[in-house]
Amino acid sequence: MQSMADMLSASGGSQQRCTGIALAEVTAIKDPKNHGRVKCRYLTADKNLGETGWIYCLTPFGGKEYGCFFHPGIGDIVALAYEDGDVHRPFVIGSLWAKKNTPPASVSDGKNEIFKLITPNKSYVEFSDAPKKEHITVSTPKGHRIDLDDENDVISVTDGKNKLDISGKSGSVELTCEKKLTIKVGSGVTITCDGNSGAVEIKTNSKIELNSAKIGVKASGEASVEGSGSVTVKSSGVMTIKGSMTKIN
């Protein structure tokens, strides 16, 4: 099959220059040198026109091991330009949507308010720029989401069953867990809330201190206070110990 350069050479183009832009379909992406190059097949009426060699892809920002990495995939439609008009040196300058490669969003209502970055497997970042309804959503195919919602003044993190809501409007934070919540601080403090049994457990290597103007402790069933060392109960006012039967020692 011919290349673009071969075709121009055969037609008498001795300088083999091309000042226009060509459309092509990506056919290979596994660059043997890992330079981010692709191979493309020209989309022309000439079915004998073959594919390019390994060619580079333009990026809006890039340098050594950093930059904006959005690589074309096999089957993507791309636009090719030519370095200094040399048909031997094409490079990808962008992608195009087409009949078989439709865009991930639309402007059907005539309002350009939704901006989206989405992968082929449907992980996405969506920006809504609608007046007074601005929000940013980050989501995976399984529904793990982060929502930054200016309309409702809420930040939400969810996996579908468990959810964290931070409300700037009400000044509240709500954490909802389906089964179990564990909070760990360093290696010495653990707080566990078990949704199945209803138990709450606090463990620490040091001490637990409650300090308030008034503290009430009430159990609908049995209540016990036990210490492996000394236990002190002290009051600067009246102390009342009351029960249907009271045993001391």
Residue ranges and their predicted role:
Residues G13, G63-G67:
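Alpha-helix capping and helix-loop boundary segments enriched in small/acidic/polar residues
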Residues W54-K64:
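Short, structured beta-strand/loop micro-motifs enriched in basic residues and often containing a Trp
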Residues T27-K30, T44-D46, D86, L96:
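A generic structural motif
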Residues R41-D46, E51-T52, G75-L80:
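Catalytic cores of peptidoglycan-degrading enzymes
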Residues D31-P32, H71:
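Residue-level "contact hotspot" at macromolecular interaction interfaces
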Residues M1-S11, C18, L23, F69, ...:
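Right-handed beta-helix
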Residues K33-R41:
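Short aromatic-glycine-enriched beta-strand elements
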Residues T52-W54, E151-N152:
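Extended Gly/Ser/Thr-rich low-complexity repeat segments
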